[in-house]
């Protein structure tokens, strides 16, 4: 170790070992000194963090500084950094009211960062405090969103539908947003939805408070998917096309695009609007990466991998699938690997595709993801058709199926 104007350690692990071996009062004293010598105006966030580490108990002043710093921390280190500041603010807050409000804010930040267990723990902390009706409805909404993003299983539609109904008299706009989340959850859950299938959610959404004039992007999308779920594709097509264009190309806030872009992508997919589907998903992947929102990034990366496979860019598809799998492992998320099934089938790897279909079907059933089961059923039929075509009399001897041309258009490179 060298001590001068800076303290230098021979290896970063030595620094960690020294820090962790120090007694708690010594660490707190050092953090307090560092806070005192850190400029309040030039680096308020670092100062707040050192003050928090130096605190021996609740401190409302430090908690308020951490809360103010959370937004700046997000800009530098992503949503996980913002969640860390807010969680520490909760720990330093003694008054029940402010503690509950900060816990709810920290829970939503943790949800967006993909820390689902932490989000639920913080929601429980918030629920134990004196919340008003809107805050309690938002706790229910958070639980539904965790169920959607963590597993997309059968529990999520009912939770989100209940939250939407609770929100109607409290916040009409948020209620409409929640109906859109519930519709997405119902599509994923399919036949495994405990309650709140696509038609039920669509009917409830059509009776929700009307959209403002002019409507927000999510209002256009909700009206389109609600008609899709009740009256069918032909009736919904004009509204879904308009919504898809707005989400793919329009002026839309990053938060809005990430939250409801998946539903817009489903609408474009239902209409086989591949151009809007690709543009929309690519835009959301880029936004989620920049914002560090791992929960949403995992879904969009897998979707982009599927599109890349359909468009013939198998290398990009494989890279995107690997990235999505890594995110899923890091966040503890279980989502059926649709993209891997599509890639194996389009490569002509019949044995691999069949094995994946069986594994994905089993996992999708266990997770309550009806969309995954339905998707695999369609892939199994497609594989049977491809197998019959590739083993018939028209197949050229010695030419592997994976190298025969397909009718899938190549629409350009996909970022990995």
Name each model-derived stretch.
Residues 1-98:
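Short secondary-structure boundary elements
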Residues 21-23, 150-151, 167-172, 190-193:
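Short, polar/flexible loop-turn hinges at active-site or ligand-entry regions and domain interfaces
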Residues 45, 136-140, 174-187, 214-226, ...:
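Amphipathic alpha-helical repeat scaffolds of TPR domains
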Residues 55, 144, 151, 183, ...:
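Short coil/turn linking the two alpha-helices of tandem helical-hairpin repeats
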Residues 64, 69-70, 80, 84-98, ...:
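Helix-coil-helix junctions within alpha-helical repeat/solenoid scaffolds
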Residues 179, 183-188, 194-203:
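Acyl-donor-binding surface of acyltransferase catalytic domains
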Residues 248-251:
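Alpha-helical transmembrane segments and their interfaces in multipass membrane proteins
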